[in-house]
Curated annotation (Swiss-Prot):
Any one of the GO CC terms: neuronal cell body
Tissue: Expressed in the adult labellar chemosensory neurons and in abdominal ganglions. In larvae, is expressed in neurons of the dorsal and posterior pharyngeal sense organs.
Keyword terms of this UniProt record: Cell membrane, Membrane, Receptor, Transducer, Transmembrane, Transmembrane helix
UniProt KW Electron transport keyword: no
Family named by the database record: Belongs to the insect chemoreceptor superfamily. Gustatory receptor (GR) family. Gr2a subfamily.
InterPro entries: 7TM_chemorcpt (IPR013604)
Lineage: Eukaryota, Metazoa, Ecdysozoa, Arthropoda, Hexapoda
Protein name: Putative gustatory receptor 39b
Keyword Aminoacyl-tRNA synthetase: no
Parts of the chain that traverse the membrane: 33-53, 60-80, 123-143, 148-168, 225-245, 266-286, 349-368
Annotated localization: Cell membrane
């Protein structure tokens, strides 16, 4: 399915986020040079901004904004470098997702289809929203002054579009996990109904040892796909979370400063255009990661319920394979993680919100000194 999107996704290559072409060696070389230019351009912007510091009378605190600005530059460098290093791995990931879809269709008779329209609407709305919300900051930067805004505009666009790309991949992974879970639920229902099972018109096939083995192999391939995704995007996800957290926290603080009339109200346009998209980024991505983990837990629960069925105990080979499958699901959790530093789920969302409150309290105490 990801292959079918590439004619559209390849335009993300203009920001250095995806490879432009799979087979053309010249295109690969040109894009690597282009990506290197993007990295150098960000570094030059950083050097110029630090070497020629702006007036201390401007809206934002110099120290805080340098920290956020550096975080953006580092994050963009990590994102682009990861794409350069994993140029061929990206298309390998696309092929693996395609092969998994074919296996689900051929061996498990699952209609893979496309994502739900709600997923497309969510991704498109977020993508358009991320671009539109840059406009208020541009307006404030033109009419007043925003420290380091113009130097970090390219970084903002790259980070936001990278999030859209990663979100699309996570939605596709979650789609395949849910399909596998539904098929396991069908197997469980067929065992429970016995001879009365009418699913697919063939109860013997759903309850067979070969079908369970195909399910087990599909789950293992799906876990490998998750692992490959984490290798491809792990560092960029980690960097993006750091930027989103720092951006949203600092801009919520400056919003509070504007509301208590420390600064002019026109700066609300800029602060809202940063922390609102950042918060939605964190919320949506954590929810998508949570969905994948819940589907993985559901798969485990279906298998454990199946192991309790009386007919399973009479078939030694089927029971042994089922026990192996249960252990495989427990040990190989289908989760989105950033190089082992964190798993993307609701617990991460709660930790981020708690950390935001803590840092906001600290910032407000410093501002009152």
């Amino acid at each position: 399915m990801l292959y079918s999107f590439h004619p559209y996704l390849k335009y993300f290559a203009l920001l250095g986020l995806v490879p432009w072409s799979e087979s053309c060696a010249q295109s690969k070389f040109v894009q690597k040079v282009y990506s290197a230019i993007l990295i150098i351009l960000n570094a030059v912007h950083f050097g110029i901004s630090i070497y020629f510091p702006q007036s201390a009378e401007l809206f934002l605190s110099l120290m805080v904004n340098v920290i956020v600005f550096v975080a953006r530059i580092v994050c963009v460098t990590v994102i682009i470098l990861q794409v350069m290093v994993h140029y061929d791995d990206y298309f390998r990931f696309c092929r693996e997702m395609k092969y998994l879809g074919l296996r689900l269709q051929c061996e498990l008779k699952i209609h893979v289809g496309r994502l739900k329209w709600q997923s497309y609407a969510k991704i498109l709305a977020l993508g358009i929203g991320f671009l539109v919300t840059v406009l208020p900051s541009i307006y404030v930067a033109l009419s007043g002054s925003l420290l380091y805004f113009w130097s970090s505009l390219l970084s903002i666009l790259i980070i936001r579009m990278q999030f859209v790309l990663v979100l699309l991949n996570v939605e596709l992974l979650g789609h395949h996990v849910s399909l596998l879970g539904i098929r396991l639920q069908n197997v469980l229902e067929c065992h429970l109904m016995g001879a009365n099972c009418t699913l697919d018109g063939n109860a013997n096939r759903l309850c067979s040892l070969e079908f369970l083995l195909a399910l087990k192999q599909s789950h293992m391939q799906l876990h490998y796909l998750f692992t490959h995704f984490n290798d491809l995007f792990g560092w960029s996800i980690l960097g993006t979370y750091v930027v989103l957290f720092s951006d949203s926290t600092v801009n919520i603080y400056w919003t509070q400063q504007v509301l208590v009339e420390v600064y002019e109200y026109k700066y609300l346009y800029a602060t809202f255009s940063v922390f609102v998209p950042s918060f939605f980024n964190i919320l949506v991505f954590c929810r998508c990661g949570e969905f994948c983990q819940r589907q993985s837990v559901l798969i485990g629960s279906y298998l454990r319920n199946l192991s309790c069925h009386p007919s399973i105990g009479r078939e030694t080979s089927y029971k042994d394979l089922l026990m192996e499958f249960i252990l495989q699901v427990e040990q190989n959790v289908l989760a989105i993680n950033a190089e082992g530093f964190m798993s993307t789920d609701n617990s991460l969302l709660m930790s981020i919100l708690a950390a935001k409150v803590t840092y906001l309290i600290v910032l407000m105490q410093f501002s009152s000194v």
